[in-house]
A protein has these predicted regions:
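Metalloprotease/metallohydrolase-associated module, dominated by Zn2+-dependent proteases
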Residues: 4-80, 100-223
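Active-site recognition of the HExxH zinc-binding catalytic motif
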Residues: 87-100
Length: 223
């Protein structure tokens, strides 16, 4: 009798994240980005962050930055999809790009150079996740351009690169917010033309009655 193969969650999770980083590096950055240390970190009030040159090898010769994703927003039955989590990964990869090829500002600030790079990869910077938000600033998130480079790259991404492990509840402060399995996902949609917003079930096709435009999913904040 052959021994049962044990599922190794750490290996599965970080292998998928590394492969996703390499995939988007190739598809959106032409393999121009250096490697980083990918981590999961429950930094408060943020989906993810990038820190430059914070890791080194035993000899102190090589240095790497860190990209962290917040597991409190990688929930099994939460509002954020794998697509939105990987949009955060690409957001932080744009910070990495700016560190080496752009005009890097002070940490966590999103300047015009950053906003333009984000747009080129198919993400629009916004202070509130809608077209009405400010494109630059200290606290800026983004929304996904439908049919843009990131959207198309995600659709073509192999299934094995999807996130294999999701958290069952969020650890925010000292409380544990249990997620009910039967609860339908509710997200905020916005009109890319007029900025009107509406709540609805995830996956619903909603048209703006004023503009007759398909409404897009609004995302939260990144650093």
């Amino acid at each position: 009798m052959e021994p049962k193969l044990m599922f190794k969650p750490t290996e599965k999770q970080y292998t998928a994240l590394q492969q996703a980083f390499d995939y988007y590096n190739e598809k959106l950055f032409k393999d121009s980005l250096p490697q980083v240390m990918l981590t999961l970190n429950r930094e408060r009030n943020t989906f993810g962050y990038y820190v430059p040159s914070i890791w080194t090898d035993d000899n102190g010769v090589e240095q790497w930055g860190e990209i962290a994703l917040n597991p409190d927003y990688i929930l099994k039955d939460g509002e954020r999809t794998d697509k939105e989590v990987y949009a955060t990964l690409v957001h932080e990869m744009c910070h990495l790009w700016q560190e080496y090829d752009g005009s890097a500002p002070r940490r966590c600030y999103h300047n015009k150079d950053f906003a333009e790079k984000m747009e080129r990869v198919g993400l629009i910077t916004s202070s509130d996740g809608t077209p009405n938000g400010k494109r630059t600033g200290q606290r800026v998130t983004h929304y996904i351009v439908e049919g843009g480079p990131f959207d198309m790259a995600f659709q073509a991404m192999p299934d094995e690169l999807l996130i294999p492990c999701h958290t069952l509840f969020a650890l925010k402060g000292e409380s544990k917010k249990k997620i009910k399995k039967a609860r339908p996902k509710s997200v905020t949609y916005f009109c890319p033309k007029c900025g009107a917003t509406v709540k609805g079930k995830e996956g619903t096709n909603i048209l703006c009655g004023d503009c007759m435009e398909k409404m897009l999913v609004k995302t939260g904040r990144d650093r």
